[in-house]
């Protein structure tokens, strides 16, 4: 039997008029102030945010573990009008998993991202939007992560990492699609389900 599989990679860039702070506020269902645009982004009325967490390398300055400080610092570091502010994985959880199992699966995925790239990851699990007629089992997560890694001083490094850039981006995305499918199957098996996903 097949379980649900969805994994996509998106970019959040200023060139499209987007703000990393606004995106983070929406995904976490919080009220954050975006210093770059001088705007308050209030999504506290948004329902269906099941879980949020910020994952970061151990030596990260503690101020960067605060959602508002983190994304405002990202906005400040990127001066160009077309700057790439963050990347995002959008994933769907197999419908078989419960809240605790979804959280464990998200933790593993985000910790892998931190380990591989040394970046800060801001993740949120959302309940399905049942009013829009979507499949009600489709719990999904938005996983935003920084385009710069954390250096030995616990701050953003001067250079952006290139893994997702034009040269080897396709390969990187294929790798993550594959490892996400493996992660889904591992968690399905671990929790006693026969269903598997195929990417």
Listing of model-derived features with the role each one plays in the protein:
Residues 1-199:
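N-terminal nicking endonuclease/strand-transfer module with a His-rich metal-binding environment
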């Amino acid at each position: 039997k097949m379980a649900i599989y969805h994994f996509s990679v998106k970019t959040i860039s200023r060139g499209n008029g987007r703000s990393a702070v606004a995106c983070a506020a929406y995904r976490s269902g919080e009220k954050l102030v975006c210093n770059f645009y001088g705007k308050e982004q209030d999504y506290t009325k948004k329902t269906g945010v099941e879980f949020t967490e910020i994952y970061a390398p151990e030596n990260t300055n503690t101020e960067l573990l605060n959602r508002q400080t983190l994304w405002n610092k990202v906005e400040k570091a990127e001066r160009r009008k077309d700057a790439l502010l963050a990347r995002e994985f959008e994933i769907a959880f197999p419908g078989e998993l419960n809240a605790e199992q979804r959280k464990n699966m998200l933790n593993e995925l985000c910790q892998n991202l931190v380990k591989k790239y040394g970046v800060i990851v801001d993740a949120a699990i959302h309940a399905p939007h049942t009013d829009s007629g979507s499949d009600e089992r489709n719990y999904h997560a938005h996983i935003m992560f920084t385009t710069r890694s954390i250096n030995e001083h616990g701050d953003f490094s001067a250079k952006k990492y290139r893994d997702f850039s034009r040269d080897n981006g396709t390969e990187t995305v294929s790798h993550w699609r594959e490892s996400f499918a493996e992660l889904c199957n591992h968690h399905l098996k671990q929790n006693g389900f026969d269903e598997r996903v195929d990417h």
